Amino acid sequence: MKAGATSMWASCCGLLNEVMGTGAVRGQQSGFAGATGPFRFTPNPEFSTYPPAATEGPNIVCKACGLSFSVFRKKHVCCDCKKDFCSVCSVLQENLRRCSTCHLLQETAFQRPQLMRLKVKDLRQYLILRNIPTDTCREKEDLVDLVLCHHGLGSEDDMDTSSLNSSRSQTSSFFTRSFFSNYTAPSATMSSFQGELMDGDQTSRSGVPAQVQSEITSANTEDDDDDDDEDDDDEEENAEDQNPGLSKERVRASLSDLSSLDDVEGMSVRQLKEILARNFVNYSGCCEKWELVEKVNRLYKENEENQKSYGERLQLQDEEDDSLCRICMDAVIDCVLLECGHMVTCTKCGKRMSECPICRQYVVRAVHVFKS
């Protein structure tokens, strides 16, 4: 048994020498010598059987939904807050990618009434994305003020660029106006210059360049056009001053504007249709004006009849109310209260009265009466 174990150990050592080298096998053999068994190894603290853990990079996720970016959720950077968002949580508008929060506030144009309609969480999320603390905000107005303040600071660069562009445009317009004024304003100088040219020699007249003459004529035509435009503006202003009601909204015609049937004939088709439309009369089948006139006449007559019948009903109702009991307002007055003699109640209510409701006199008896 010992010889077999020795031969097997020798073969293993030879294989290890071929693979790892002689020094490694000798180190292993020294470990075997100190061990209690023939196949036990001493633990090496510098050697680990597990591979080293790979260093994990920063896990970049979407700021809105918290999911990792993938093929279906591509990474996009918001042009306002400069944060990373996926394609689902961002909106593409005018070739600019914005997150849903920035897009929501951008739609309000940063107007206070529109911002007050938003939710508190949207305003708070907008400020958090820009690393603005919101701990001191207790009301919604505080968040809106903070958003407006931050937007004003953030738009200073835009204001600078716009002011630069405006200054450039002002300078360009100044030079343009000064250039044209040199040709348009001194019209007398131009005319005198033309007179000198006409009085001069033939050589001097022929030596005048055609470009100068064209500039002179164009300047004169521009002066005439400006004068015509000013005259037109003055005429429009005078017309508005004379007829101030034209600029206001025109009052629609109604049935109350008619005093008699003769007024219907003098109304236009538009006014007739307005009257019919306001009184819920269908005029879709009317092709001629006389058809509209007939409908308006019929409507006017029916309105007059309704007013008369309504007045008669009110009169009858007043008369009926005069004959009703003043207590129950249901039965007819058919009782006389004694000793005062007032007739203000029915028999049923008169028997229950202890005193007259008019003179407050004690009721001795309630007598039922019949009308002849």
From Swiss-Prot:
Coarse class of the protein's main subcellular location: membrane
ZnF RING-type span: 325-360
EC number: 2.3.2.27
Entry's Gene Ontology BP terms: apoptotic process; negative regulation of extrinsic apoptotic signaling pathway via death domain receptors; negative regulation of signal transduction by p53 class mediator; nucleotide-binding domain, leucine rich repeat containing receptor signaling pathway; proteasome-mediated ubiquitin-dependent protein catabolic process; protein K48-linked ubiquitination; protein ubiquitination; regulation of oxygen metabolic process
SUPFAM superfamilies in the record: FYVE/PHD zinc finger, RING/U-box, SAP domain
Sites bearing Phosphoserine, chain numbering: 169, 254, 256
Keywords in alphabetical order: Apoptosis, Cell membrane, Cytoplasm, Membrane, Metal-binding, Nucleus, Phosphoprotein, Repeat, Transferase, Ubl conjugation, Ubl conjugation pathway, Zinc, Zinc-finger
Pathway connected to this protein: Protein modification; protein ubiquitination
An annotated Gene Ontology molecular function: zinc ion binding
Entry's localization field: Cell membrane; Endomembrane system; Nucleus; Nucleus speckle
UniProt biased composition (Polar residues): 201-220
Zinc finger intervals, FYVE-type: 56-107
Top EC category: transferase
Positions of transmembrane segments: none
Topological category with respect to the lipid bilayer: Peripheral membrane protein
Catalytic activity field: S-ubiquitinyl-[E2 ubiquitin-conjugating enzyme]-L-cysteine + [acceptor protein]-L-lysine = [E2 ubiquitin-conjugating enzyme]-L-cysteine + N(6)-ubiquitinyl-[acceptor protein]-L-lysine
InterPro entries associated with the record: CARP1_2_FYVE, CARP1_FYVE, RING-FYVE_E3_ubiquitin-ligase, RNF34L-like_HeH, SAP_dom_sf, Znf_FYVE_PHD, Znf_RING, Znf_RING/FYVE/PHD
Residue ranges of domain SAP in the record: 115-134, 264-278
Modifications made to the protein after synthesis: Autoubiquitinated (in vitro). Proteolytically cleaved by caspases upon induction of apoptosis by TNF.
Site positions for Cleavage: 231-232
Cellular component annotations (GO), alphabetically ordered: cytoplasm; cytosol; endomembrane system; nuclear speck; nucleus; plasma membrane
Protein purpose: E3 ubiquitin-protein ligase that regulates several biological processes through the ubiquitin-mediated proteasomal degradation of various target proteins. Ubiquitinates the caspases CASP8 and CASP10, promoting their proteasomal degradation, to negatively regulate cell death downstream of death domain receptors in the extrinsic pathway of apoptosis. May mediate 'Lys-48'-linked polyubiquitination of RIPK1 and its subsequent proteasomal degradation thereby indirectly regulating the tumor necrosis factor-mediated signaling pathway.
Comment field on protein domains: The RING-type zinc finger is required for the ubiquitination of target proteins. The FYVE-type zinc finger domain is required for localization and may confer affinity for cellular compartments enriched in phosphatidylinositol 5-phosphate and phosphatidylinositol 3-phosphate phospholipids.
The protein's assembly and partners: Interacts with CASP8 and CASP10. Interacts with p53/TP53; involved in p53/TP53 ubiquitination. Interacts (via RING-type zinc finger) with MDM2; the interaction stabilizes MDM2. Interacts (via RING-type zinc finger) with PPARGC1A. Interacts with NOD1.
Protein name according to UniProt: E3 ubiquitin-protein ligase RNF34
Organism field: Pongo abelii
Chain's gene name: RNF34
